[in-house]
UniProtKB/Swiss-Prot annotation:
It comes from Atrax robustus (Sydney funnel-web spider). The presence of a 'disulfide through disulfide knot' structurally defines this protein as a knottin. Belongs to the neurotoxin 06 (delta-actx) family. This is Delta-hexatoxin-Ar1a. Keywords: Disulfide bond, Ion channel impairing toxin, Knottin, Neurotoxin, Secreted, Toxin, Voltage-gated sodium channel impairing toxin. InterPro entries: Delta-hexatoxin (IPR008017). PROSITE patterns: DELTA_ACTX. Expressed by the venom gland. It is found in: Secreted. Inhibits tetrodotoxin-sensitive voltage-gated sodium channels (Nav) by binding to site 3. It slows the inactivation, causes a prolongation of action potential duration resulting in repetitive firing in autonomic and motor nerve fibers. Does not depolarize the resting potential. Does not affect tetrodotoxin-resistant sodium channels. This lethal neurotoxin is active on both insect and mammalian voltage-gated sodium channels.
Amino acid sequence: CAKKRNWCGKNEDCCCPMKCIYAWYNQQGSCQTTITGLFKKC
């Protein structure tokens, strides 16, 4: 995780893909519901 602004949320994995991050900022979804298991391990 390079930058804090890339986090999906306070309790979310910061290695989530960009689509998940933008969805979270737009309140359209979260890492848990959008994409699971891809970028969980850092």
